[in-house]
Amino acid sequence: MSLKRILIMLLIGAVALCFSGCDLVTANTEELLSPPELTGELRLIKEALESSVNTPITLKYPSSGEYRSPVILRDVDSDGTDEAFAFYSTSDTELTSMNLSVVKYNKKENRWFALDRQTLTGSGVEKVVFSDLDSDGTEEIVVGWEIYAASEKQLAIYSVGETATTQRMLERYTTFLSTDLDEDKRPEILMQFLDTDAATNTASLIVLDENGVLKYGQCSMDGNVKTVLTPVLSPLSNGRPAVYFDEIKGVGAITEVIFFSKGELQNPLFDKEKLENKITLRDSALHINDINEDGILEIPIAKELINADITSTEKLNYTSWCAFNGENFTEMKLSVINTLDGYRIDIPEKWYGKIAISKNTEKRERVVYNYITDKEPSGEADETGEIGDMVVTLKTVTHSEFNSGRGFDKKKAVEICRGEQLVYLAIIPENTEGSVKVTIEELKQMIVPMQF
């Protein structure tokens, strides 16, 4: 390397150090990841808070939901002036307390001042929601407190007065969200709590009245699940508002749909006799999805598919994407999904019950065959038929494998589509017999990359 090039490299390095904005000797990960200091009005609010508490505080950021700031400005009483809601922790010996303080602005004195604070032992804030639950014109603040990280949480509801904040409820929960399931133009909180020790799972619809908390709707859910994913507020296919819960059950997943009807909270997919939901049980990688982009969520439901590999005992399935109206399912799309390679095959109606598939995970191949049977498809695999001619071989390769031509027959394989890392290929045999046939152009419409 020439002396000139060495000098240029040293100069570039020196300039980079000057403009790096941190001390390479003293910087550490905690400092680099620490949140920015509050400025302007928020700084004044924090100073008012610190003067009222008289102990060091650490601002706490909600980990999910719409509000992610430790200090939230919102006009909850519609008087034209924002109130500030501050979340912070304080430490006393070995205990850490989580705190909520409402900080108001005094126009006459041109300063912020803190009301009394609400305190409980905990570790963080999961989510914050504002909702007028007692219809008095002032929004309540609904806080999901993390007691022991995500393993135990408590839901608190607070009402804000002129001079004090009142706690209206404090209960254990797993998930919650603001809804209007009964469509009375009055918001409610739908709270769900999974008690894995007791194997119970319950959804409750909560409002406030003059006597306090009113749970005017409650229903059981599957208590055999281990994990509840984030619930989604979305309409049924008939337009009625509902909340969809995807849950992990054993090695699979289920969906429960909660809505309000006939004066009660309903969960019709829950079998009250067997105390579980089995009708939606499928691969754990499959979740609710608006698969046809019509604004209605579809639930993935498993239907048996013939395994063409007679040496394999593995059960294969179609995935039926179904809209739900609260009583019945309507199939919107039928797919065969490869979760390992990240794609689905949207199956034409005329193929249903007339194909069998073999899978080779090591070679990243799926082979579709004709399946010869006189029986009409019923959702259960008809094993009385026969495996017929091959329809198509689907193969997945990486971009580098595709570019180098490794691992597949370049003369026969045709690219159907590609994702960020993978290329999906098809090989259609010549002179195939059978009722099911396909072209490359049809496959390009049928195969869709998916993320799992």
Locate predicted features:
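Active-site donor-binding loop signature of nucleotide-sugar glycosyltransferases
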Residues: 160, 396, 428
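Secondary-structure transition/turn motif
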Residues: 248, 370-378, 427-433
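Beta-propeller-forming repeat regions
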Residues: 21-357, 400-419, 423, 445-452
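Charge-rich, low-complexity amphipathic helices
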Residues: 7, 98, 373-374
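Surface-exposed amphipathic alpha-helical segments
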Residues: 426-452
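Sec-dependent N-terminal signal peptides of Gram-positive bacterial secreted proteins and lipoproteins
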Residues: 2-27
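Secretory pathway targeting signatures of secreted, lumenal, and periplasmic proteins
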Residues: 348-415
